[in-house]
Structures are given as C-alpha cells and as structure tokens.
C-alpha cells in the first residue's frame, strides 16, 4: 500500500484545532482521507476545498449532494476572471458555479473519511473538517492530431485531494454553517 504524505501532520492538526476552537485534542481524534491523481479540474477543486473547510461532515455532504442536483452552487472566490458576475445571485456571492464532477469526487472522499472515522471509533456527528486541500498532480500526456500532419499537446491534469477532520466536543461543533457573504 502506498504511503501518502499529507501536508498536515497530526500534531499540526491538533494545534490548528486549538487555535480555532480552543480545545485540546489527541491524534486519535483525527481522521484523514486522501485521493491521489483524480481526473478533475484543479481550480474547481481548490474552490470546493476552501468552501467545505469548517463544515461538519454532515453539512458538507448535504451541500455537495445539492451541488450534484444543481440546487445550490459553490462560491468562486479566486478563479473568477471572465466569469458571469451577478448582482445578488445565490446568497450574496457575485460568482458561483456547480462543479458537479468535482462534487461527486469529494462526496466519495467524504464517504471514505466517514468510514476511516468509524474505523477509529470516532463519533461521526461531531466530525468537523479542519483541513481540506487540493494540490496539482501529474499531467497525463496526450496529443490531438491536427491538419497537415501536425499534432498539439493535449494533456490531462490530475489533482491530489486531502481532507482532515477532527472529533470536537458537542459545545464547540458548529450548529449551522455561516456563509461568508460578499459586501457590495
């Protein structure tokens, strides 16, 4: 079985929880999931990872299921050049999208995270996503034949996705996810 290198160690995750929530946890209260070399958009993966960070596991799964059903979008904060900006669209974001393929892959990863947490004996209702990251993976080389015997490189990008969740005490677990609305 390959050994994956997470960008966050258990000690760093415990320190991150203490800084944000003021609670000391042990490495046994941390669950991780990693999906290497996923064939999906890196930019959309970064936006989804940024959005689900801070949610409980149940909240993130519910939101991403709504994205797959095209009911609720994901806000786009970084990669928004040449995208449609709306006056007051979905709950105050000027740019939002429905990255269905990315949401399906993240749902599979969240399912993996939930199973890892159950295996460690953690309470799934109290799991909060404290770290989510998407890193560029390898490029799968490909070529597109062109006219007059030419060829153009047509590479496929891959993404390495990691999610870290921590089991927090009930009084610290966020009841409802607060959305960061854009002030105009």
From Swiss-Prot:
Keywords: Ribonucleoprotein, Ribosomal protein, RNA-binding, rRNA-binding
GO cellular component annotations of the record: cytosolic large ribosomal subunit
InterPro entries in alphabetical order: Ribosomal_uL22 (IPR001063), Ribosomal_uL22_euk/arc (IPR005721), Ribosomal_uL22_sf (IPR036394)
MF term (GO), any: rRNA binding
Pfam families named in the record: Ribosomal_L22
Any one Gene Ontology BP term: cytoplasmic translation
Role: This protein binds specifically to 23S rRNA. It makes multiple contacts with different domains of the 23S rRNA in the assembled 50S subunit and ribosome. The globular domain of the protein is located near the polypeptide exit tunnel on the outside of the subunit, while an extended beta-hairpin is found that lines the wall of the exit tunnel in the center of the 70S ribosome.
PANTHER family tied to this protein: 60S RIBOSOMAL PROTEIN L17
Family stated for the protein in its record: Belongs to the universal ribosomal protein uL22 family.
HAMAP family: Ribosomal_uL22_A
Subunit structure and binding partners: Part of the 50S ribosomal subunit.
Protein name: Large ribosomal subunit protein uL22
GN (gene name): rpl22
